Amino acid sequence: MPMAQESMKFSLIRLNNFMRDRTLKGLEGTDLKASFTPVLAALGDTDGLTVSELSHITGLDKSNITRNIQQLSELGYIVKDSRNSPIILTRKGKDAADLIMKIQREAYDELISCLDDDERRMFIGVAAKVFRSIEGKGF
């Protein structure tokens, strides 16, 4: 693999690790696990989603979503009435989603603090293009 691709690969791994570590640190003292964060963050932006919708939005497979939903329900973060009904956050779940978004926003702000306004716009544009490409391939 050419050096530029290796460098990009390791940079992406480090970015992922940075976000994961900041999230874990922010969740200390709660009963939340890092695996809950994509589900809670996705639900925090909606009035409810189905398992299929959560799977599409988060990129997690349905069995992973189902496990997280079961645990989040047992902990009182979500309500799910029936198999095909939307999953809805409880007040506790909304508070958790707000906390997760705050943690991730602070981590993101720290990540891009070294960029000027033009570089930030470019970074966001390139990232959006990459993610659109990935989505088009079924990820």
Model regions and ranges:
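N-terminal leader segment of winged-helix/HTH proteins
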Residues: 1-30, 77, 86
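Short amphipathic alpha-helical elements of helix-turn-helix/winged-helix folds
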Residues: 18, 42-46, 126, 133
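N-terminal helix-turn-helix DNA-binding core of bacterial DNA-binding proteins
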Residues: 22-64, 71
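Charged, amphipathic alpha-helical coiled-coil/dimerization segments
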Residues: 70-129
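Short amphipathic alpha-helical interaction elements located at domain edges
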Residues: 121, 131-139
